[in-house]
């Protein structure tokens, strides 16, 4: 009987998680469509639309460089393994070490890319006029810090998912997209969309899952020790 009850409990958790992520996916499609409509109506087929697309080139490279999306997949079994053994201290410790390392790498990479943005644009967009070049560089620099939010927030989401808590992680992309929409509507130009993307990244991918993890018992601090003493 205990095994049967445990199986039913596990099945219920899977069903709830599936419902949450299914609803999130559906809402993300709807909100994403609204975002595309707002971007299209606001920027149209002007040069600003091209700037909006080009502004993500360097930030997306930073995310790719640090394998932001893959980190959640990699960390989940690590956290689940600690929890399966009842090792809460180990789960806390492993999270802090990964989080601390990522934060250091992200800040360093962001600073380097922020400083190098004009030179990188010379390589990937040669022949661009000086005014357009300066405008694109400014947009890229607005978006670069957002990658810190996405990567660290993804790690916090993995912490929550390992504990079968999915609502905060599932709502993060929705809030990010809503930030883009609100920024574009308020600003009315490509810069407004970029500021909205940054604000949405802070609120959605970073703050919501991180605060949920802290409320759920995560004790977050810098920890650099490579091995247990």
Feature locations, PLM:
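Membrane-embedded alpha-helical bundles of multi-pass transporters/translocases
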Residues: 1-229
């Amino acid at each position: 009987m205990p095994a049967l009850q445990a199986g039913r409990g596990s099945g219920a958790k899977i069903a709830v998680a599936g419902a949450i992520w299914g609803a999130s996916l559906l809402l993300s499609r709807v909100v994403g469509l609204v975002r595309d409509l707002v971007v299209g109506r606001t920027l149209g087929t002007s040069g600003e639309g091209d700037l909006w697309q080009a502004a993500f080139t360097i930030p997306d490279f930073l995310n790719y460089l640090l394998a932001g999306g893959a980190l959640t997949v990699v960390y989940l079994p690590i956290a689940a393994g600690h929890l399966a053994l009842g090792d809460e201290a180990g789960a806390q410790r492993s999270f802090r070490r990964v989080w601390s390392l990522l934060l250091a790498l992200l800040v360093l990479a962001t600073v380097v890319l922020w400083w190098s943005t004009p030179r990188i644009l010379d390589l990937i967009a040669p022949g661009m006029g000086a005014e357009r070049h300066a405008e694109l560089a400014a947009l890229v620099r607005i978006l670069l810090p957002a990658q810190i939010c996405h990567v660290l927030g993804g790690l916090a989401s993995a912490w929550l998912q390992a504990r079968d808590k999915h609502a905060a992680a599932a709502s993060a992309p929705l809030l990010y997209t809503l930030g883009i929409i609100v920024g574009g509507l308020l600003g009315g130009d490509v810069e407004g969309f970029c500021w909205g993307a940054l604000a949405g990244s802070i609120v959605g991918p970073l703050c919501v899952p991180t605060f949920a993890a802290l409320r759920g018992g995560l004790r977050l601090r810098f920890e650099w020790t490579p091995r247990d003493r």
